[in-house]
Curated annotation (Swiss-Prot):
The chain crosses the membrane at residues 85-105, 165-185, 187-207. Keywords: Chloroplast, Membrane, Plastid, Thylakoid, Transit peptide, Transmembrane, Transmembrane helix. It comes from Arabidopsis thaliana. This is Protein COFACTOR ASSEMBLY OF COMPLEX C SUBUNIT B CCB1, chloroplastic. GO terms for cellular component: chloroplast; chloroplast thylakoid membrane; cytosol.
Length: 267
């Protein structure tokens, strides 16, 4: 008893009082309160320990960032997010995709030749009437007839489109901005100066504007049946011109069912 009085007092006297109260309770009640207290302590530990770990990690990252403000890539590797190898691999794959943009720009100045067979929806139309509609369409497009044989050949000059030039410039700007963003992370020595490469994007529009002018040939052959009715119209030429002719003359491609688009006006 003397030893207990000489010993230093506890820092939390209420804990000692609680222990005394618990010991004075019945056995079952005492066991229930001890179990409850252990559960509360376990939950508290589960909450406090992760918070302390996160707090210490945040402090370490902040101190490291103050010492190395320009090394975002190294910081990410140090914190276990990504490795240098993964960043360089991603950069390599992204750079490889850039030639796809160059391919798009080159294809924009070249025509895609297609050959399609159409049928007339209105069976009451005479072949001469359909031929007049075809001639009127290509005449308005500044095409001239160069051959009046069995296959009629129309020749015209394609001019560049301002909308197409603007679209190519915009797509190139977005692509180069993405490349600049990747380079600022991978090679931070140049900082935001990498974004100056977007100044090259207007070159895409200039390239298209200078190369888009070209001559086009459209060949049309009308197949007339034994009863004097028009059976088929075979058209060969630039896919854009062929599609515009199909829409204006309300033709259907043979063996195909045409479904109007959501934003296409009904005639």
């Amino acid at each position: 008893m003397a030893t207990k009085l000489i010993s230093p007092p506890l820092s939390c006297p209420w804990v000692t009082s609680r222990e005394v109260i618990i010991k004075g309770l019945p056995r079952r009640r005492r066991e229930w309160m001890v179990t409850k207290r252990n559960r509360v302590s376990a939950v508290t530990a589960m909450i406090v320990e992760p918070l302390s770990v996160v707090s210490s990690s945040a402090i370490q990252i902040h101190q490291w960032w103050e010492q190395n403000p320009n090394s975002l890539l190294l910081m990410t590797e140090a914190t276990g997010g990504y490795s240098l190898a993964s960043y360089y691999t991603s950069l390599g794959l992204f750079v490889i995709s850039v030639p796809g943009l160059w391919s798009l720009i080159k294809r924009s100045v070249k025509s895609k030749i297609v050959r399609k067979t159409f049928v007339v929806n209105d069976v009451k139309k005479e072949p001469k009437q359909v031929a007049g509609e075809i001639l009127s369409f290509f005449t308005r497009k500044n095409f001239n007839i160069t051959d009046r044989g069995e296959t009629i050949t129309f020749e015209g000059k394609m001019v560049p489109s301002r909308g197409q030039a603007a679209l190519l410039t915009f797509c190139t700007c977005i692509s180069l901005a993405s490349v600049g963003l990747v380079l600022t992370i991978t090679v931070p020595d140049f900082g935001n100066n990498w974004f100056f490469i977007i100044l090259l994007s207007p070159l895409a529009g200039v390239y298209y504007w200078k190369k888009a002018s070209r001559k086009e040939e459209i060949k049309v052959k009308m197949m007339v049946g034994s009863k004097g009715r028009l059976d088929e119209i075979v058209v060969q030429g630039d896919d854009v011109q062929v599609e515009e002719m199909r829409k204006e003359l309300q033709l259907n491609e043979k063996g195909m069912v045409y479904v109007k688009g959501l934003f296409e006006r009904s005639s």
